[in-house]
């Protein structure tokens, strides 16, 4: 939507900001102001009232309104109004699901690059609720999603506040984004890049924040195989920082950075990775490590300033990623002229039914622990139809993740996809679902 780009250009010249009152937090008297603010934001975003913020739900809409008001309160210009920018998603049943993106803007000072942007985003939604059958009775559980991704949203608000207060340091401009319907294969970020923002060619880089609350088990940065971003991370980590991420070469999980990567925009994904309470009613505020989140925030802020002021990173692969792909282009499944086929069908559902679910074994220990959910598996189909490099983009638990990857990776040959009549390496992502039903003892 060109309107957003026009508003951004106008805001480069002026800033007028309303403010809102926010109730101060109680308790935790010795924690920092930043930690107290993140704690309060998480308490609201992960509250039972929002019912897990499922895409299209009233809980997601309320989360969008909350993030909008908090950004305004921190003095950041919100581009999309109090409700966020609406967009629709056509569902398989023909209905349209309505979601919202929240976009805000911080202007850069250097006129030569102020019309170039660093996008910093976090997903707004999660899976909402789920049902279990216990002793023959259906029971609804809320996935409160404190770590996934109230933690990223709380950090996004604080990061926006820090950048706004120190905007005199920023050569490039910054777009703050809370993406709706992210769990629907990144619908919000796709809409932003393909329908909403007209100056995509001037987005120099993207920073994605997702699941950042459990740093004691690891703090990671995935630069999407980009050599320049890897160097940026290395340079910053060589300086005195409160915490330093481990740079990883495998994508920790699926998130909104992928839409930017597909547009060949250099992207870095910050996360503390998967955790046992993921997508369950146990993902509550109590598992978050706020002191570590504050340390992560400081590092990510310094990285964002570095991106805003440094040379534009080029979209190029590092040696490890280039070696994995052997210099060959990877084409997303849906962009192939002739899509890959399994047993004569281009529908990935046939692969799931005829192969995956036919040979999938529910791990006994997972059954004992009551672990269930959907594992998002990504894999490549090479020019000969062989399945390679199967790995988890969005996991549930190591027991289920390992079984899903094992079955997908053992797939028989496909008929490869083609572009302009020639076989290509194609990339497929699909969910493998583990359904657990507890039956009444007889």
What are these language model-derived features?
Residues 179-272:
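Metal-dependent peptidase/peptidase-like ectodomains
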Residues 276-325:
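His/Asp/Glu-rich mid-to-C-terminal helical/loop segments that flank catalytic regions of hydrolases
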Residues 311-442:
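Charge-biased low-complexity segments
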Residues 24-32, 48-58, 89-93, 138-149, ...:
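Second-shell loop/turn segments in exported
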Residues 45, 71, 89-134:
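Acidic/His- and Gly-rich active-site-bordering loop/insert found
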Residues 53-107:
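A non-catalytic alpha/beta surface segment that caps or lines the substrate-entry region
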Residues 104, 120-126, 130-185, 300:
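Alpha-helical metal-binding/catalytic segments enriched in His/Glu/Asp
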């Amino acid at each position: 939507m060109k309107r957003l780009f026009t508003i951004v250009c106008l805001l480069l010249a002026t800033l007028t900001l309303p403010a809102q009152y926010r109730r101060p937090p109680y308790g935790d008297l010795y924690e920092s102001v930043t930690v107290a603010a993140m704690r309060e934001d998480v308490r609201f975003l992960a509250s039972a009232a929002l019912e897990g913020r499922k895409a299209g739900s009233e809980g997601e809409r309320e989360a969008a309104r909350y993030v909008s008001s908090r950004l305004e309160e921190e003095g950041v210009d919100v581009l999309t109004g109090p409700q966020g920018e609406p967009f629709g998603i056509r569902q398989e049943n023909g209905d349209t699901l309505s979601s919202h993106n929240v976009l805000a803007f911080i202007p850069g000072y250097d006129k030569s690059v102020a019309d170039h942007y660093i996008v910093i985003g976090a997903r707004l939604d999660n899976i909402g609720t789920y049902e279990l059958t216990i002793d023959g009775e259906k029971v609804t559980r809320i996935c409160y999603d404190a770590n996934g991704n109230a933690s990223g949203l709380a950090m996004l608000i604080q990061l926006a506040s820090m950048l706004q207060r120190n905007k005199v340091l920023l050569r490039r401009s910054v777009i703050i984004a809370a993406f709706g319907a992210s769990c629907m294969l990144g619908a919000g970020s796709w809409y932003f890049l393909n329908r909403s923002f007209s100056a995509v060619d001037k987005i120099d880089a993207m920073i994605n924040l997702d699941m950042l609350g459990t740093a004691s088990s690891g703090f990671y940065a995935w630069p999407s195989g980009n050599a320049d971003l890897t160097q940026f991370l290395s340079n910053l980590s060589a300086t005195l920082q409160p915490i330093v991420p481990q740079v990883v070469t495998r994508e920790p999980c699926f998130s909104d950075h992928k839409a930017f990567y597909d547009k060949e925009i250099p992207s870095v994904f910050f996360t503390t990775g998967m955790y046992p309470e993921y997508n369950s009613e146990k993902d509550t505020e109590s598992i978050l490590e706020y002191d570590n989140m504050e340390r992560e925030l400081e590092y990510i802020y310094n990285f964002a300033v570095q991106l805003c002021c440094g040379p534009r990173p080029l979209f190029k692969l590092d040696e490890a990623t280039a070696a994995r792909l052997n210099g060959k282009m990877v084409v997303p499944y849906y962009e192939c002229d002739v899509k890959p086929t399994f047993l004569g069908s281009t529908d990935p559902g046939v692969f799931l039914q005829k192969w995956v679910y036919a040979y999938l074994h529910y791990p006994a220990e997972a059954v004992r622990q009551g672990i269930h959910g959907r594992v998002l598996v990504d894999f490549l189909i090479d020019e000969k139809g062989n399945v390679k490099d199967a790995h988890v983009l969005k996991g549930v638990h190591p027991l289920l993740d390992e079984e899903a990857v094992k079955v997908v990776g053992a797939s028989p040959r496909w008929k490869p996809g083609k572009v302009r009549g020639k076989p290509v390496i194609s990339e497929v992502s699909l969910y493998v679902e583990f359904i657990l039903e507890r039956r009444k003892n007889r």
